[in-house]
């Protein structure tokens, strides 16, 4: 969990410090106040481009120095539970008209205690420099590292209004969603996915060159794709199996049970390497690689109604997606010993009162949950303490 969050020149926040407790963190304020911007900042403490998938240059505050910083202190959730914090009312300052140059990213010292288990407070930070606005910097305990290293210390899952149509969106969006779920259970997944994509881009460029491509170089790239692609496929399928089993075993409740399956390419290292070697001419003509795990789709069904999620009503699709995320959060906590941080943007506003109350009951005592809404009344059903933050007031 995050025990401290500092934003410097991030979106509309010039200089913002929050001290959230464990459990519920409720952000309320008018539209445009910067609630989702805070969630986006938290989401950058995970590998990837954050919950908006925006370019880094877009995140720096307009009128600022052209850079931004997001810093946080991570604390073991198990040590904070029942410690008496919470019920803390923090007033987030309104965006400033001007601000000094952003502070440098923290340079805290100390040794990391253990991979994947936070034994003591850990300082993490990410951001950019004005001289390189599209180059992301990541630091853990003051040491510069890669974004993929963040997953060893913190798992973050999110739901946003933009994901409401996930089941009818292009397959690539569902693959991206599945990859985030997989990464939480298999930290090496990000490495394999990045290496696979890099090798595939290099192969595509080589096939597009005029003249006869270098066969040995093609074979070397295809061997890399086969090695990392098979690992990507295996991790995804393991996640689908584990999560699908958990969903199927759940009792009927306010969130319908979802069935999960993968459709498309499947195979091991040998199968993928053979497929790639045999499809060079076809891929060259198409201008892209047509076989491999990048062509897989996540198929979701409404189990209780035995029909595709894409055919469900808008309300049912939202409830199915929320049920998947909740089940996955339980699975992560069970298998890693640390509950994930959940970011739920405007989720409460789209649920009826009974489902909203059921959501709060389900999430109580299960880690840190950040939620946004325009009205305080949306969160009246929270039973217990919460950090309530008024944004932009």
State what each model feature region is.
Residues 1-30, 44, 61-65, 76, ...:
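Conserved NTPase motor "head" modules and their coupling/switch loops across ABC/AAA+ ATPases, GTPases
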Residues 35:
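Conserved lysine of the Walker
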Residues 46-78, 85-100, 112-173, 177-189, ...:
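Nucleotide-state sensing region of NTPase/ATPase domains
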Residues 157, 370, 387-390:
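Hydrophobic/aromatic beta-strand patches that form the interior of the parallel beta-sheet core
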Residues 163-249, 254:
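An accessory alpha-helical subdomain
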Residues 345-347:
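Walker B catalytic acidic pair
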């Amino acid at each position: 969990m995050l025990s401290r969050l500092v934003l410097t020149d991030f979106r509309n926040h010039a200089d913002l410090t929050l001290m959230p407790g464990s459990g519920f963190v409720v952000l309320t304020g008018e539209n445009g106040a910067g609630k989702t911007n805070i969630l986006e900042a938290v989401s950058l403490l995970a590998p990837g481009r954050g919950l908006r998938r925006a370019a880094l240059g877009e995140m720096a505050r307009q009128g600022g120095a052209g850079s931004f910083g997001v810093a946080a202190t991570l604390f073991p959730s198990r040590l904070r539970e029942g410690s008496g914090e919470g019920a803390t009312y923090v007033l987030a300052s309104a965006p400033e008209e001007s601000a000094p140059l952003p502070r440098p990213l923290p340079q805290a010292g100390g040794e990391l205690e253990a991979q994947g288990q936070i034994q003591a407070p850990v300082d993490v930070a990410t951001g950019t420099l004005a001289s390189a606005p599209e180059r992301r910097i990541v630091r853990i305990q003051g040491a510069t590292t890669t974004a993929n290293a963040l997953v060893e210390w913190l798992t973050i899952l999110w739901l946003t209004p933009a994901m409401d149509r996930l089941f009818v969106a292009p397959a690539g969006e569902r693959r991206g969603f599945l990859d985030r779920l997989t990464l939480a259970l298999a930290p090496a997944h990000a490495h394999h996915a990045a290496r696979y994509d890099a090798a595939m881009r290099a192969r595509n460029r080589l096939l597009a060159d005029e003249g006869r491509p270098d066969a040995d170089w093609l074979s070397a790239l295809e061997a890399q794709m086969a090695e990392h692609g098979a690992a990507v496929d295996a991790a995804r399928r393991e996640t689908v199996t584990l999560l699908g089993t958990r969903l199927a075993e759940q009792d009927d409740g306010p969130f319908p049970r979802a069935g999960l399956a993968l459709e498309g390419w499947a195979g091991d290292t040998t199968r993928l390497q053979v497929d790639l070697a045999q499809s060079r001419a076809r891929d060259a003509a198409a201008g892209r690689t047509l076989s491999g795990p990048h062509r897989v789709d996540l198929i979701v069904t409404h189990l209780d109604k035995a029909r595709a999620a894409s055919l469900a009503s808008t309300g049912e699709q939202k409830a199915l997606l929320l049920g998947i995320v909740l089940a996955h959060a339980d699975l992560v906590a069970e298998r890693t010993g640390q509950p994930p941080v959940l970011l739920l943007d405007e989720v409460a506003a789209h649920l009826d009162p009974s489902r909203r109350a059921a959501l709060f009951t389900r999430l109580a005592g299960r880690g840190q949950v950040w939620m946004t809404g325009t009205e305080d009344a949306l969160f009246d059903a929270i039973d217990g303490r919460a950090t309530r933050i008024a944004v932009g007031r």
